Amino acid sequence: MAQIPPSLQDLVNRFNQAQAQLQNVLLRKQQYEAELKEVEKAISEIERLPQDAKIFKNVGNFLVPQSRDVALQELRDRKELLELHVKTLTRQESMLREQLDKLREEINKELAKLKGGATEAAKGGG
């Protein structure tokens, strides 16, 4: 078996690293999207409550009373932050996918060179 050239090995290493980064980004994005759905559901439920409804916020091991308006504002702020995180991670995902496509092309070119060189060596050596 022929040894893999350092240039090809470097491309494969970079590809694997980008793939791992993409998996990490996708996992984080999925977590933020799940939390975003929960926040949106909470906002929807609280908006249906009367203005004087008793609302409690979970703080550690305690439930602390909170006004409806304050609870809604905190949830809306959290929603805005989560949407920003999702948007940022979506951009990172897109960039990583482009990077992976380019690396895949480069790897295929290197493999084609190796295959072509091996074919030439076999023809010349026969």
From Swiss-Prot:
Subunit structure and binding partners: Heterohexamer of two alpha and four beta subunits.
Gene3D superfamilies: 1.10.287.370
Keyword Protease: no
Extent of the signal sequence: none
Task performed by this protein: Molecular chaperone capable of stabilizing a range of proteins. Seems to fulfill an ATP-independent, HSP70-like function in archaeal de novo protein folding.
GO molecular function, one term: protein-folding chaperone binding
Pfam families associated with the record: Prefoldin_2
One record GO biological process: chaperone-mediated protein complex assembly
Keywords (A to Z) from UniProt: Chaperone, Cytoplasm
One CC-aspect GO term: prefoldin complex
InterPro entries in UniProt: PFD_beta-like (IPR002777), PfdB (IPR012713), Prefoldin (IPR009053)
The name this protein goes by in its record: Prefoldin subunit beta
Cell location: Cytoplasm
Family: Belongs to the prefoldin subunit beta family.
Keyword Cytoplasm: yes
